[in-house]
């Protein structure tokens, strides 16, 4: 897979390019092939050490860049690797079908579940169709419809959060964007089935929260969750979007800080270098955590499940 390298990854990219060049020479054969194998191994070891060093000490701004990586897996990638028999459901039964938010019935390890998530799209054409992963009110109303359907058929709800935010256009506001988000918060807090939310990329403000209320909230290691983007915060506080790195550090938008504040429950590890380097391994990590959490939630009856969720929500903030 051809990768887009971020600025802080460039030394890694240079080493990987050297390794690939030597491999190409080695593939051509010749009397020096065996000697090249030794040099390739040395470079690979050096590259691995550099990756470990680089990714062991990432700042909030670097994590924010990784969360937006164009090759990071989206909900449809997770559906492909984690679920079987996915049947997409469309439309909010009121206005339109929003392609920025995907949902449908699937099986997780044989168990029927409702899967809902943001889809940003790859390539210009798909990004436009998906509205860059920013849902309009009809997207959130579709999610509400699917969650209520899941409750009727006693299926757990699993969400994948990856959006810069809800679409702020005039039409979206006219059709009740804030009401659609608020209604989802209410519905999700009252569902009598297990709800597990996973922040897998950008968790942007109300657009993320609208499918982010659950019994468990998980975050991938290099995902973010905040009320505003670092650039937006910098523009408001300092009138300078170039100060986004400072804003990112101050906002506490990374998984360890949010876990410390008890705003999320679990941090799910990503492969070395980020989820974009190995979609399948990332999906497997999430799948195993979901299976563990569903097993735990199955021990609760409906009343106990709702009480647990209520207490979880009431624990947010400072008293």
Curated annotation (Swiss-Prot):
It is an enzyme of class 2 (transferase). GO terms for cellular component: acetyl-CoA carboxylase complex. It is found in: Cytoplasm. InterPro entries: Acetyl_CoA_COase_a_su (IPR001095), ClpP/crotonase-like_dom_sf (IPR029045), COA_CT_C (IPR011763). It catalyses: N(6)-carboxybiotinyl-L-lysyl-[protein] + acetyl-CoA = N(6)-biotinyl-L-lysyl-[protein] + malonyl-CoA. The keyword Thylakoid does not apply. GO terms for molecular function: acetyl-CoA carboxylase activity; ATP binding; carboxyl- or carbamoyltransferase activity. One of its GO terms (biological process) is fatty acid biosynthetic process. Residues 35-296 form the CoA carboxyltransferase C-terminal domain. Keywords: ATP-binding, Cytoplasm, Fatty acid biosynthesis, Fatty acid metabolism, Lipid biosynthesis, Lipid metabolism, Nucleotide-binding, Transferase. Pathway: Lipid metabolism; malonyl-CoA biosynthesis; malonyl-CoA from acetyl-CoA: step 1/1. The keyword Transferase applies. SUPFAM superfamilies: ClpP/crotonase. It comes from the Bacteria. Its EC number is 2.1.3.15. Acetyl-CoA carboxylase is a heterohexamer composed of biotin carboxyl carrier protein (AccB), biotin carboxylase (AccC) and two subunits each of ACCase subunit alpha (AccA) and ACCase subunit beta (AccD). Belongs to the AccA family. Component of the acetyl coenzyme A carboxylase (ACC) complex. First, biotin carboxylase catalyzes the carboxylation of biotin on its carrier protein (BCCP) and then the CO(2) group is transferred by the carboxyltransferase to acetyl-CoA to form malonyl-CoA. PANTHER family: ACETYL-COENZYME A CARBOXYLASE CARBOXYL TRANSFERASE SUBUNIT ALPHA, ACETYL-COENZYME A CARBOXYLASE CARBOXYL TRANSFERASE SUBUNIT ALPHA, CHLOROPLASTIC. This is Acetyl-coenzyme A carboxylase carboxyl transferase subunit alpha. It comes from Aliivibrio fischeri (strain ATCC 700601 / ES114) (Vibrio fischeri). The lineage of its organism: Bacteria, Pseudomonadati, Pseudomonadota, Gammaproteobacteria, Vibrionales.
């Amino acid at each position: 897979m051809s990768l887009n390298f971020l600025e802080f990854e460039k030394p890694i990219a240079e080493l990987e390019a050297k390794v690939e060049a030597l491999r190409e020479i080695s593939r051509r054969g010749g009397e020096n092939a065996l000697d090249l194998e030794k040099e390739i191994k040395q470079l690979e070891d050096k590259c691995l050490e550099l990756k470990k060093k680089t990714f062991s000490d990432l700042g909030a701004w670097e994590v924010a860049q990784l969360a937006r990586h164009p090759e990071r897996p989206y909900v449809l990638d997770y559906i492909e690797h984690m679920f079987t028999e996915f049947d997409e459901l469309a439309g909010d039964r009121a206005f339109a079908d929003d392609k920025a938010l995907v949902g449908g019935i699937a099986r997780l390890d044989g168990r029927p579940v409702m899967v809902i998530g943001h889809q940003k799209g790859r390539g210009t054409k798909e990004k436009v169709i998906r509205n860059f992963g920013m849902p309009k009110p009809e997207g959130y109303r579709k999610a509400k419809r699917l969650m209520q359907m899941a409750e009727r058929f006693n299926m757990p709800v699993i969400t994948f959060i990856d959006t810069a935010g809800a679409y702020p256009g005039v039409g979206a506001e006219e059709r009740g964007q804030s009401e659609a988000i608020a209604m989802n918060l209410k519905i999700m807090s009252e569902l009598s089935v297990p709800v597990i939310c996973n922040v897998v990329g950008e968790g942007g403000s109300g657009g993320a929260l609208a499918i982010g209320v659950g019994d468990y909230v998980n975050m991938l290691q290099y995902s973010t969750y905040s009320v505003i983007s670092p650039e937006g915060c910098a523009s408001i506080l300092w009138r300078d979007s170039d100060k986004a790195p400072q804003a990112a550090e101050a906002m506490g938008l990374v998984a360890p800080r949010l876990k410390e504040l008890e705003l999320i429950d679990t941090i799910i590890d990503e492969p070395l270098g980020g989820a974009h380097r190995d979609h399948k391994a990332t999906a497997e990590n999430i799948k195993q955590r979901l299976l563990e959490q569903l097993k735990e939630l199955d021990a609760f009856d409906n009343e106990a499940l709702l009480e647990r969720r209520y207490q979880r929500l009431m624990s947010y903030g400072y008293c």
